[in-house]
Amino acid sequence: MVPQTVNNARRLIMFGVAMGATAFAVGATADPPAADEQPPGTLQEITVTARKVEQRLQDVPISITALSGADLQAQGLSNAQDIVQSVPGITVSSAGPGQAKYEIRGLSSVGGESPTIGFYLDETPVTPPASATTGKSAIDPDLYDLARVEVLRGPQGTLYGAGSMGGTVKLVTNAPNTRAFAASTQSTASGTDGGGVNYAQKGMLNLPLIQDRLALRIVATYAHESGWIDRIVVPDFPLETNSGTTRGNVLGQAARIYSDVNDEDLSGARVSLLYKPTDNLTITPAVFYQHIYQGGMNTFDGDPGTLAHYQPFDVREPFTDRFTVYSLPITYEMDDLSLTSATAYWSRQSSQLEDGSEAVQDGLQLPAFDVSAGGVGPVQAFEFDDTHQFSQELRLASHGSPRVQWLIGGFYSDYYDQLYTGGGNIPGLLTAADGAFGTTNLFNVHEPLRVKEVAAFGNVTANVTDSLTVEAGLRYYSYHSDLSSTATGFAYGGDTPVIAAATASASGLNPMLNVSYHLNPDLMLYATAAKGFREGASNFPIPTTGSVGSVCLQNLQAIGRDSAPGQYDPDTVWSYEVGEKGRFLDRRVTFNSDVFYIHWSDVQQPVALACGLGFTANGSAANIHGAEAELEAEIITGLTFSQGVGYAHSAFAQSFAASGISAGQSLFDAPNWTINSSLSYARPVGDFTLVGLVRNSYASSSEDLSYQVNRLPGRDRLDLRAGVETKRWSAFLFVDNVMNRHNILENIDLLTFTGPSYNRVATDRPLTVGIDIGFTF
């Protein structure tokens, strides 16, 4: 019997082939306009820099989606996590603002400590190989006054290097304009079901200081989002039952209720200066700053499943994230060459406080929560991550020959991170268990990490004929990481520091080959093969002595080990893709589709031990096959329909018992289907334009891994937006999450011990209704 997923894949591939054949027939019979013309009424053309040079989106022979600044504004997309609503093949799991993890084509980042998706702010890579729980999380910048967002699907290891094995998300800001003054503001107010009032104020100012030579652009943002999850303190909190696998009833009379604790305040600014001392030289220094504060976590207790966290003590759980980027792009144009230098330094400080009271009581098998009854009292676990990275890229590109273009470059990065994590000071540890713990310190860890990487890359594009183009690229990379750790506390045998150090290093090559053929100016076929990789790293040592350590040792021995591995190696992917890109019916219809196959070797996987700790190891290989299709059509003047479909079937090739993985099991956080649909309308009426948008995004069910394998239901979200635009102002009414679905985004691990009975579940924002008013000057 053929599995249903295979049938689904075949149907989608056949759909893509049929649509492509239909498009080919239309394209072959129609007389298309010249390539550089854009007749009235045609769909918008977007220029992108996905391949480090400017190209029209439809001329880039890879699977890529781009959203222009106008698209972002028209669709009301305000932060990076929102882009998944309009892009097929990409999903996001998030425990809150600044904690998003992106997955493309099923390449999830459940294992390892670095992401599988590259994330760029202009020329600056902001996807470090971090060691913290939030290390795989991308920054969450506000999207106001962006030029565009580019989402590249498939490995981008040649031009973008480490971390881009699944694809790359690139945010491109608007450069200062040296010829015209400009300013804009946007004000938003809304209300969230089960929450409160949300509001935001954003503004942009562009000042041409010296015509054609010097300009300044300033963007500022402040936003407040109300919470919708409560924190409930329960007296006489029930103990876990059945050895910690079933939570006690927490729905009794509450002692105190804190409503909507996960409220968020975001403030940020972006300042950029464009200086052209000569016609050939452009210098664009910029500073981006953003600060996020959240009063509580975006998670509720999986058991009992209400939108609340129940706790035996009054323990706050605030989160902060501060991010600063200093960048200095310099471009010098010569007759046939372009020299680009991209220098950047960024820092990020994030902190999370978390209620560990329930986890510690259960993990240590204490008879009660209260100190008077033999417990340890309240526990506030913490994690603080202080990250810094310097990067330098230098590129030389040709643009003189119509037949051959080439690009060569070098890259260097120096990343330094300090992780501080612990269970806090717990006075009750001294009295619990008749003083057996002997300390008030459950655990306290300081973990510095330094990673240095160098790379050299090159790319050659040969236009063999007017229709046939062959492109080849190669990147050499080498990295070395040094990790040290100092651990104290009961979990590590007492207050005598346990000191450990480990190193990890690797080098290799990432090749790429692409062939494209234009059947006519509006229809292109392409095929590409590419390799990508993700860096390995060192593991934090697992204690094997003491009360907790002895249990960990038993857990390790049960999987055939006496200790955690000192490091895990890079994992790599080989991707093979065939696709088409076409514009038809006088360019009123755009249809792009592709099919792909990915082989993922040495997949980095988390290993969770029953003692509540864990490590990362290289597991079995995995295979992914799938297809994507994007359709955009102007049905009648002003009415545009967009449809994006992504299918990715993933499976582990072998079993990996240490992580509970069996052969044929789907990868974690990898839904088979992603579907994005929208219908937009714009009709001029005098000096006004009436606009409307209906958008639906869907991701099928998947599994994720915290302490155990969890089933994530499918996500289905409907948004509405309608309003009026003029040349100077706009006003929109919007309804987000119309059906008020509490879509589950992920299950999270705790900072202390973790286990199924106190699983925490992250959800997206409920039904939100509001108004959005903007002015331009």
Where are these regions (language model features)?
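N-terminal Sec signal peptide and the immediately downstream disordered periplasmic leader
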Residues: M1-Q85, D279, I283, A633, ...
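Outer membrane beta-barrel strand-and-loop segments of large Gram-negative receptors
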Residues: D31, F369-S398, A436-F437, F443, ...
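Short acidic/polar hinge/loop motifs at secondary-structure boundaries
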Residues: P125-R153, Q201-G203
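Transmembrane beta-barrel wall of Gram-negative outer-membrane proteins
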Residues: A182, G194-G295, R322-V325, T387-Q392, ...
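Membrane-embedded beta-barrel scaffold of Gram-negative outer-membrane proteins
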Residues: K202, P329-G356, H518, M524-Y526, ...
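Gram-negative outer-membrane beta-barrel transporters
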Residues: L407, N463-D466, V470, T590-W600, ...
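C-terminal beta-signal and adjacent terminal beta-strands/loops
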Residues: S697-L705, V724-F777
